Amino acid sequence: MTPTTPADFVVAIPARYASTRLPGKPLQLIGDRPMIQHVAERALLAGAREVWVATDDARIVAAIEHLPGVHVAMTGTAHLSGTDRLAECARIAGWDDQACVVNLQGDEPFAPAAGIRAVADLLQRSGAQMATLAAPVDNAHDLFDPNVVKLVRTAGGDALYFSRAPIPWHRDSFASQHDSVPAEGQWLRHIGIYAYRAGFLQRFAAMPPGMLERTESLEQLRVMEAGYRIAVAVTPEPFPPGIDTADDLVRAQMRVASA
């Protein structure tokens, strides 16, 4: 078992301007600040040793380059995923292979600091190649929504599988109804925050996508199909949903306005 002292970690935030569902998403205002600034401030609040934003757009650079404690990596335009972009960011930043890198999505302006620290601590504590978080599914809509990724894990906390399907499948309950969460069993939804060592991040980005990833369109399945461990912990406090659509943005703006 690895040491239990709080992890020393860096945070890398992939930020892409050309979002399909919400163009210019990182620069959309929430209150008086762009979304990407909120995310970077959450990372700083969590106690990250360094915070980097990885982007290929000069408009995003201009919006955050003035922020104290936040670095910007101008990355290439051909990356197919956030993992590829973060791998380039890690090379630009010059992180040692053993550095703990937390991948915090650029559309998580309300990510709790405790959750960011928790995923870094989990990586250190578990000895797994990757770490991530989950939260209980408490409603049938999320359970059967393919946009809400579900997961199952071992008794020791390692991921067994991630899926857009409602796993585990409750043979008796699901055969007759899809409008409630069965009382027996536990269903978990994935929270898309990751931690890995910088060296493993490079290895991950270099792996070809496997059949499972191509089928489910879930990048983390590449790691599992290659035989590596992903440790999963239930988040220590609620993780508000990220922002994917214009409706999500309106709700976020209302949340800040009412605070």
Swiss-Prot record:
InterPro entries reported for this sequence: Cytidylyl_trans, KdsB, Nucleotide-diphossugar_trans
Catalytic activity entry: 3-deoxy-alpha-D-manno-oct-2-ulosonate + CTP = CMP-3-deoxy-beta-D-manno-octulosonate + diphosphate
Entry keyword Cytoplasm: yes
Class of enzymatic activity (EC top level): transferase
E.C. no: 2.7.7.38
GO biological process terms, semicolon-separated: CMP-keto-3-deoxy-D-manno-octulosonic acid biosynthetic process; lipopolysaccharide biosynthetic process
GO MF term set: 3-deoxy-manno-octulosonate cytidylyltransferase activity
One Gene Ontology cellular component: cytosol
Compartment(s) where it occurs, according to its Swiss-Prot or TrEMBL record: Cytoplasm
Broad class of where this protein is predominantly found: cytoplasm
Coiled coil regions, renumbered to chain: none
Zinc found in the keyword field: no
Bilayer-spanning residue ranges: none
Pathway it works in: Nucleotide-sugar biosynthesis; CMP-3-deoxy-D-manno-octulosonate biosynthesis; CMP-3-deoxy-D-manno-octulosonate from 3-deoxy-D-manno-octulosonate and CTP: step 1/1; Bacterial outer membrane biogenesis; lipopolysaccharide biosynthesis
Gene3D superfamilies: Spore Coat Polysaccharide Biosynthesis Protein SpsA, Chain A (3.90.550.10)
Keywords: Cytoplasm, Lipopolysaccharide biosynthesis, Nucleotidyltransferase, Transferase
Entry's family note: Belongs to the KdsB family.
NCBIfam families assigned: kdsB (TIGR00466), PRK05450.1-5 (NF003952)
Function of the protein: Activates KDO (a required 8-carbon sugar) for incorporation into bacterial lipopolysaccharide in Gram-negative bacteria.
Protein name from the UniProt record: 3-deoxy-manno-octulosonate cytidylyltransferase
Gene that this polypeptide is encoded by: kdsB
